[in-house]
Structure formats: C-alpha cells, structure tokens
Amino acid sequence: MSHGGKRRSGDGGSEGSSYSPLVYLKRPYFRKSRSCPLAQCPDEDIDYKNKVLLSKFVSEYGRILPSRITSVSARKQKLLARAIKRARYLALLPYC
C-alpha cells in the first residue's frame, strides 16, 4: 500500500550521502569578533559618578547587561559592574 506521499530525492536514498544542515551555513562555527566599545576609554573614566556612561550598560529594568550583548572585555565588564553597584548604593542609579 502506498502512503500517497511523493518521494523526494535525497531522503536517505542509496547515494551514500547523508543530510547535514551545516552544509547550508556559510561558516557554522565562526563568530565574528567585535572590539570592545570601551577600548579607547581609560580605566579612570569608568567611575560611579559617570551616570551617562553607566546607563548605557544597564537595561531598562535596571539590570547590568552581560558582556556577550555589549561586547565589553572582561576587565572593563568587571570595572563597569563595580561602578554600577557603587552608583546604586549611593542612589545615583536605580536598582530596578
């Protein structure tokens, strides 16, 4: 009995090739590296009193944005987190 469906070529036929979705991606395991937006900024500029700079790295809900979103280096992310927490403690930035 036939199921009524048409058989497509490449559905595991006898060609010996298997389907791989990675064939259709340009570069499957390649991530484009982005430079740190604070690379030109010295460490002294990342300060708890600099509300304009700190507010760029805080979400609308008051949470610190992760470095995978902001593409900030690990060192600058640590300095930013410390400055944001100090600014929150001194009521310069909101907690939420």
From Swiss-Prot:
Gene3D superfamilies with a match to the protein in the record: Ribosomal protein S18
Region described as Disordered: 1-20
MF GO annotations: small ribosomal subunit rRNA binding; structural constituent of ribosome
GO cellular component: cytosolic small ribosomal subunit
Any single GO BP term: translation
Domain of life assignment: Bacteria
SUPFAM superfamilies: Ribosomal protein S18
Transmembrane segment boundaries: none
Keyword Acetylation attached: no
Task performed by this protein: Binds as a heterodimer with protein bS6 to the central domain of the 16S rRNA, where it helps stabilize the platform of the 30S subunit.
NCBIfam families assigned: S18
Family: Belongs to the bacterial ribosomal protein bS18 family.
Subunit structure: Part of the 30S ribosomal subunit. Forms a tight heterodimer with protein bS6.
Protein name per the record: Small ribosomal subunit protein bS18
Organism of origin: Anaplasma phagocytophilum (strain HZ)
Organism phylogeny: Bacteria, Pseudomonadati, Pseudomonadota, Alphaproteobacteria, Rickettsiales
